[in-house]
Amino acid sequence: KKKKKLCYLEALKSGTTCVMDMFRFMDRCADAAGEIGLRVNLAPYVADQPGKDFFATRDENKRLIKTRHGSQQGRIKVWMGLEHLFYCSEDAYRDAVRCQREYGVRIHTHACEQKEEEAAVLAHFGRRSIGMLDHYGLLGENTLLAHCVWLNDDEIKRLADTGTAIAHCPVSNAKLASGVARTPEMLAAGIALGIGTDGPVCNNSLDMFEEMKFASLIQKATRLDVTALPADQILRMATIGGAKALGLDKEIGSIEVGKKADLVMLDLAMPNLTPHEVTNDGGNLLWNLVFAARGSNVSRVWVDGRCLIENGRSTQVDEARVLETAQQCGVSLYERCRAMSHLRVDMV
């Protein structure tokens, strides 16, 4: 819970109002989200293969749906979570599909993140990842796949045809040397595509402004095309695109009559956002938001009409206490890790 309060606070202070969170200890995550005020979709790391018992179980996932789904005035949603094809049995995938229909929830899992992963999946199962998920009945408009870096043309078409959504995590994919996802082709095919950070372990930051900028620049650089993934497409992916990927586009993701008041305000009187031009057609605000803004420019944030960040500070929790507690926990964790020299790996 202490770690999650830190993560949710960082996300909220940098202008994120809604997250998809796949992790363990989901009851504590729900409690932390309730305290911070963030809108959170929870998907437990579920695995049932031998040797993977440190992950959550299917029974825990179902209990969480029954006890937490729709809590905090509807801000907490619980999904069926599945870690990966090598961690979950066929029965786990098919059970998730059954539960999705029975409980009216959604499904989240990882797919096609690394080139070596795809080769291993093909060698083990005789199909690529998307083919296996399709075989298990997982693809569809209620499923969100993380990463999808190594999709071919047929797989992009299949995901588009089934309405399967993708969480695009460009900084994580770059840091872990996973590759560069084919986001322009995904968008052209009509796939619901949102932008994600993947979390502090694989990214070191939860700043969506950083993620937006990098998502555009990595496409321009690798394609040698300055027009690739322009600012307007990026902003849509980070707002209404993400809402659609989460199945929440009727409630959030844009400022419209009847939608929830999830809003972010930036202080434009900052060096990195000056000069700025505000006109009826937007002026240079779009480019400033995507290529110049940072999470530290956020001054106010509302979720469900409640002001959770005022003048850059949380209105719900004692930030100093959250940081102090997280610092103590972090130092303790570092010390324990140093004692396990046989598990030590080079930091990247």
Regions found by a protein language model. Name each.
Residues 1-37, 59-71, 327-332, 338:
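Alpha-helical scaffold segments that flank or form the walls of functional sites
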Residues 15, 33, 80, 110, ...:
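Divalent metal-coordination and catalytic microenvironments
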Residues 20-23, 79-95, 174-177, 245-247:
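Active-site glycine- and acidic-residue-rich loops that bind
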Residues 28-150:
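Metal-coordinating catalytic core of metallo-dependent amide/deamination hydrolases
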Residues 115-127, 155-160, 177-186, 203-220, ...:
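Histidine/acidic-residue-rich catalytic or RNA/ligand-binding cores of hydrolases
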Residues 135-142, 184-272:
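His/Asp/Glu-enriched, well-ordered alpha-helical/loop segment
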Residues 151, 155-164, 169-175, 183, ...:
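Long hydrophobic segments that form regular secondary structure
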Residues 239-348:
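Active-site microenvironment of metallo-dependent hydrolases
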